[in-house]
Amino acid sequence: MVKRKANHVINGMNDAKSQGKGAGYIENDQLVLTEEERQNNKKRKTNQ
């Protein structure tokens, strides 16, 4: 039997293009968070 490509496969699905360069990192190192924003960040990380 000949292997056929499935119709539902989308080309490039395994490429991480949507994440872009440096995904997940803050590029601006001088970004200063207030104490309240730091607490919020900790809460968000535990929920993910």
Swiss-Prot record:
Highest taxon, organism lineage: Bacteria
The protein's name: Small, acid-soluble spore protein O
Family annotation (InterPro entries): SASP_SspO (IPR012613)
Disordered as annotated region, ranges: 1-23
Keywords: Sporulation
Protein family according to the UniProt entry: Belongs to the SspO family.
Pfam assignment, any one: SspO
GO CC list: endospore-forming forespore
Keyword hit for Nucleotidyltransferase: no
Major site of localization recorded for this protein: other
Induction: Expressed only in the forespore compartment of sporulating cells.
Source organism of the structure: Bacillus velezensis (strain DSM 23117 / BGSC 10A6 / LMG 26770 / FZB42)
